[in-house]
Regions:
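Active-site-adjacent structural segments surrounding the nucleophilic cysteine of cysteine proteases
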Residues: 2-139, 182, 190-193, 200-203
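Soluble periplasmic/extracytoplasmic beta-strand elements of cell-envelope proteins
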Residues: 86, 177-179, 211, 221
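A mature extracytoplasmic/lumenal domain signature
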Residues: 82, 159-161, 180-184, 214-216, ...
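Loop/turn elements at helix/coil->beta-strand transitions in domains of secreted/extracellular proteins
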Residues: 149-153, 171-177, 216-219
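Surface-exposed ligand/attachment interfaces on beta-rich extracellular proteins
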Residues: 161-168
Length: 255
């Protein structure tokens, strides 16, 4: 009887351990879901995205080379791919890989001492991995300017409203690197960490970087590195909302 009870206990412990392993794996997957923010193979349609429009022949668009994250191998490197598109528009041969080499970067958002870093200073994570983060405008500007070596230079036009961007830049055939969200869906609360100055930072899952290449009365048009099959447009009001939520961040290259 004692042996039977012991055997049943061992079986129970093993079953519990296996079940806990499955629970832990599921929890880890769920934890990472909000962070897989940059890369997908979008099934873009008017049924799933009623505010989307495909660019048509005759639309007034800046002809920026279209690159994709998939082809670049950068699942979470939308910022790098978007910047490369704009640089190639100006005749530069700079690649997303060169931009990643040049950018200030860290592997994880929090170091061994528990101190976090800001995406305003660093590219966070590995762009080849689906659980990477990315960066905001400032480190991308620094990387671009390292590579351009003053022949041209990146300019931070943060807080410029979209109507002004349309009049000032698009009208002069100047494409704009712009922060919004994937497929213009609402951002979600991502991981939170403490910065060196003691302030709390929260990553917005769904953060995305695109190239603004045109506008009409109702839509803004983008080269979207997450979608490599053509220029797509989103309703202006929706783009404005996502642009605001991501801190009204935008970059242009001086001519």
């Amino acid at each position: 009887i004692i042996l039977l009870v012991s055997l049943l206990c061992l079986i129970g412990i093993y079953a519990y351990a296996k079940n806990w392993e499955k629970i832990s794996e599921a929890a880890e997957d769920e934890k990472n879901k909000p962070l897989q923010a940059h890369y997908s193979i979008p099934m873009l349609s008017h049924e799933t995205l009623p505010l989307l429009k495909y660019a048509e022949e005759g639309d007034a668009l800046i002809e920026v080379p279209l690159l994709s994250q998939k082809d670049s191998g950068y699942k979470t490197g939308c910022e790098l791919v978007s910047a490369a598109m704009v640089l190639q528009y100006y005749g530069e041969t700079i690649t997303p890989q060169q931009l990643y080499e040049a950018i200030d970067k860290v592997d994880t958002p929090v170091n061994a001492d528990g101190i976090g870093v800001s995406p305003h200073k660093y590219f966070i994570g590995n762009p080849e991995k689906s659980n990477g983060y990315g960066c905001y405008a400032e480190p991308l500007i620094n990387a671009i300017n390292k590579l351009l070596q003053r022949e041209r230079y990146a300019v931070n036009i943060k807080d410029t409203d979209l109507a002004t961007i349309e009049r000032t830049y698009l009208a002069q055939d100047t494409p704009v690197i712009l922060w919004a969200t994937i497929q213009m869906k609402p951002p979600k609360e991502g991981n939170r960490w403490t910065l060196e100055d003691g302030t709390q930072f929260q990553w917005l899952a769904g953060e995305h970087c695109l190239v603004l290449v045109g506008a009409d009365e109702d839509y803004y048009y983008f080269n979207d590195p997450d979608y490599g099959d053509g220029v797509i447009g989103y309703e202006k009001e929706l783009v404005q909302q996502r642009y605001d939520e991501l801190g009204r961040q935008a970059i242009v290259i001086s001519r």
